[in-house]
Amino acid sequence: MPHISWAQHRPADAQRGVFMGLVHALTSTAYGRELGIQSPRDISRRKDFVKRLPVVHYDNLKPWIMRAMKGEKHVLWPGDTNWFAQSSGTTSDQQKWLPVTKEALWNGHYKGGKDVLAQFCAQVPDAQLYQGKHLILGGASSLVQESATTWKGDLSAIIVRHLPPWCEARRTPC
């Protein structure tokens, strides 16, 4: 858990590292090229970021998302975007699809869960958390294939379908 401790003690450095990683990824995408972002140096400062990367509505990103959903690589994220999660539609009645990458699953959802479990075990060492099964509740479990390389559905279906082995071994229901 050294990375958690480091982030707690140096939050600005931790956030800057995440920010620069995202900026670097943006330079490898069609969206980044469209915005004229060739190098992380182009938006390494806050004022450059605000100027070059405007706040947009879903409808502005929808054509980019649809390109990725059809299987095009390097659109909004480097490489493949294999999954698209249906939003709950809180801003309008329209169905919205949110890109979910392998990196988002592993570095966000799964890493976050692992970090929470590690913190819990460190604070409650006699909890016997790993003595039995873990109940995992989710929404709809089916995914619909959209193209040869992309699927869409509920975020919980995407997460549960690709659980890491350390989690899958203890999951219930299976």
Q: Where are the regions a protein language model picked out?
A:
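Nucleotide 5′-phosphate-binding alpha/beta core
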Residues: 1-86, 92-174
